[in-house]
Amino acid sequence: MKSALLFTLVVAAVHAQSPQVISPAPRRESNEIDCPEYCLDVYDPVGDGEGNTYSNECYMKRAKCHNETTPPAWKDLVLITGSSTGEQPPSKKCSTVCPDVELPVCGSNRVRYGNPCELRIAACEHPELNIVEDSGKACVGSKVTPQEG
């Protein structure tokens, strides 16, 4: 009885892996746009040039694909990214929205920001301050004018 059950399971497993049972993935045209149904919750914020910020590029693509008022035209899409090294995004429009994630960082201006995204917004809005992430300085809860010296 056990060998019959084992044989049935093996046959079912082999049949399930058979190329005749598994249909090939449909081929996409070269001009067809990638419209993901699901995205990983990975925090790597991007902006779309219209002031919208998304958790990552996948969520941005998904939003653009499902927004019927905005046809997805990836050729005209400008990604806005920043970094904690003071690099400015390629657009003059600064993002204003950050995910509600508590991951405190200290800026070179001695201001404590709730997360790296908030630091990037401050750096974008005040490029003259050249704000970057700085773990070597003491951070405070409110803005402190740096000591001149």
Swiss-Prot record:
Domain of life: Eukaryota
InterPro entries: Kazal_dom (IPR002350), Kazal_dom_sf (IPR036058), Prot_Inhib_GrowthFact_Antg (IPR050653)
Annotated keywords: Disulfide bond, Glycoprotein, Protease inhibitor, Repeat, Secreted, Serine protease inhibitor, Signal, Virulence
Site (Reactive bond): 41-42, 100-101
GO annotations of cellular component type: extracellular region; host apoplast
KW Cytoplasm (keyword) present: no
The keyword Manganese appears for this protein: no
Listed GO MF terms: serine-type endopeptidase inhibitor activity
Residue stretches making up the Kazal-like domain: 29-86, 88-141
Disulfide bond sites: 35-65, 39-58, 94-124, 98-117, 106-139
Biological process (GO), any one: effector-mediated suppression of host innate immune response
Sites carrying sugar chains: 67
Major subcellular site: secreted
Inducing stimuli: Expressed during host infection with the highest mRNA levels 3 days post-inoculation. EPI1 and its host target P69B are concurrently expressed during infection of tomato by P.infestans.
Pfam families according to UniProt: Kazal_2
Span of the signal peptide: 1-16
Subcellular location as annotated: Secreted
Quaternary structure and interacting proteins, as annotated: Interacts with host subtilisin-like protease P69B.
Reported function: Secreted effector that interacts with and inhibits the pathogenesis-related P69B subtilisin-like serine protease of host tomato. Inhibition of host proteases by a pathogen extracellular protease inhibitor forms a specific type of defense-counterdefense mechanism between plants and microbial pathogens.
Protein name: Extracellular protease inhibitor 1
Source organism: Phytophthora infestans (strain T30-4) (Potato late blight agent)
